[in-house]
Amino acid sequence: MTIEQILEAIENMKVLELNELVKAAEEKFGVSASAPVMVAGAAAGGPAAEEKTEFDVVLTDVGSSKVGVIKAVREITGLGLKEAKEVVDNAPKTVKEGASKEEADQIKEKLEAAGAKVEVK
């Protein structure tokens, strides 16, 4: 299997499947996917802080149109009805991780149009 084939397989996975993959890789290789914590800040004259390029879209509140929000979550994530309903029922919940700024803004607009409250982190 080539790297391109692996990336393509990952690209086609649903959010829940990606989460399971990360957990399995952490257990198999004894590593953690969480970012390391920096103890000290950058020294004066050090490199400037990098601009954030990946964003997480978090569904914070469903609002009054639960059905519309479930439809939007299904459209955005490709999840089945049951999985999308679980995401909506368990808000606040991350809908998309590692999205570009443009993609995160588009997802936020779709969910807000469906009546949800959304946060981009």
From Swiss-Prot:
One of its GO terms (biological process) is translation. One of its GO terms (cellular component) is cytosolic large ribosomal subunit. The keyword Protease does not apply. GO terms for molecular function: mRNA binding; structural constituent of ribosome. The keyword Ribosomal protein applies. Pfam families: Ribosomal_L12, Ribosomal_L12_N. Keywords: Ribonucleoprotein, Ribosomal protein. Disulfide bonds: none annotated. It comes from the Bacteria. Homodimer. Part of the ribosomal stalk of the 50S ribosomal subunit. Forms a multimeric L10(L12)X complex, where L10 forms an elongated spine to which 2 to 4 L12 dimers bind in a sequential fashion. Binds GTP-bound translation factors. PANTHER family: 39S RIBOSOMAL PROTEIN L12, LARGE RIBOSOMAL SUBUNIT PROTEIN BL12M. Forms part of the ribosomal stalk which helps the ribosome interact with GTP-bound translation factors. Is thus essential for accurate translation. Belongs to the bacterial ribosomal protein bL12 family. This is Large ribosomal subunit protein bL12. The lineage of its organism: Bacteria, Bacillati, Bacillota, Clostridia, Peptostreptococcales.
